[in-house]
Amino acid sequence: MEKFKLLKLGKPATLLLEDGTVFRGKSFSNPQTVTGEIVFNTGMTGYQEIFTDPSYNEQLVVLTYPEIGNTGTNLDDYESLKIQAKGIILKNLSNAYSNFRAMRSLLSFLKRHKVVEIHDIDTRALVLHIRNNKTMLAVISNETYNLTFKEAKATIKYGKHTLNSNLASRVSTSLDYYQWMQPLNRKLKFGYSIIRSFNSAINKKLHTSKKLRIIVLDLGVKFNILRYLKSFECEVIIVNYKSTYQQVMKFHPDGIVISNGPGDPAKINRVVVRVNKFINKKIPILGICLGHQILARCFEAKTFKLKFGHRGLNHPVGINKRMEITSQNHGFAVNFEFLKSNKFYANHLNLNDGTLAGISSQNFPLISVQYHPEGSPGPHDSNYLFKYWVYIIYKSKSS
């Protein structure tokens, strides 16, 4: 563990929003100017998992909780190999940290990954502004304190071009495929008891120890999704999002996961075409977040951009008197209209705004959710979904 030092205020820095609104703050980062879509997360904890979540690629993340950094960072809480957020916006940045797993401070972690931060920002006023207007592009600069909109115009224009591109290509594995070997950490226990009892029951019922082979179509998958799948004694193979139907089928998959990821699902229609072939083959499919939107678009559903998205650790979802608290991170949602014509069930609704949060099919062995059942960070109300999906696979194989 590194020793911490008390921080000075840092050098002046500017946050300039696309609509011309300016916030002044301080920064300890090396001099740089970055642009991205400004979004906010309402979680009180889990900042390391948030920053390394590939769904935040090309975004500037505002954390609404005022004190960030006091549990440090560690080797367990990575959700990808690096920080994916383009920039971090905070009220207070603590360099003093205390946690039994902590290895380094948040500031050291950000500097190691060369990610710009700006702190001493009135995050309450900033989030209210985003909520009342909408998510928009913004620029963080600790190079030019008196940055003007005119000076930032070219940077914002470039940011718009990037945001409207295929972001999955930036976060998907560069390999054709690789195998995931790490299960959930038994010492942390979260979710592990439900998995152990299920594995024992399935092996006893089916008199088999044969592992299921799960293919994960990587649109920006979080590591904890892979850890859950591996803990169910599955063989987990991650493939590039551009993998063809033939390339995936050569693995003879028992089930396919369409992962979470960043950006607009309408920008990756080629993935929709390929996933349709898996659906017609009646392979059990699980869609998570962006994967949920991709599956819905396979049935000609419309997707639309939310005003300020759902990003936090306490979003309620439910239907028919059952409710779960979920972790969410998305800026798009699926329109309801496709449900009736395609014989789908709405399994979950977002109880904050009524948007569609989960579906299953009458005709195909697939389920998808707009939230993150793996948590990380967040509650564990929905981790049963992995157990249920694995059960669907076994049921499909035995029928």
Swiss-Prot record:
Keyword Lyase: no
Domain of life (superkingdom): Eukaryota
Keywords attached to this entry: Amino-acid biosynthesis, Arginine biosynthesis, ATP-binding, Chloroplast, Glutamine amidotransferase, Ligase, Nucleotide-binding, Plastid, Pyrimidine biosynthesis
Residue span of region CPSase: 1-209
Span of domain Glutamine amidotransferase type-1: 213-399
GO biological process, one term: 'de novo' pyrimidine nucleobase biosynthetic process
CDD domains: GATase1_CPSase
Annotated Gene Ontology cellular component terms: chloroplast
SMART domains, per database record: CPSase_sm_chain
UniProt-annotated location(s): Plastid, Chloroplast
Protein name: Carbamoyl phosphate synthase small chain
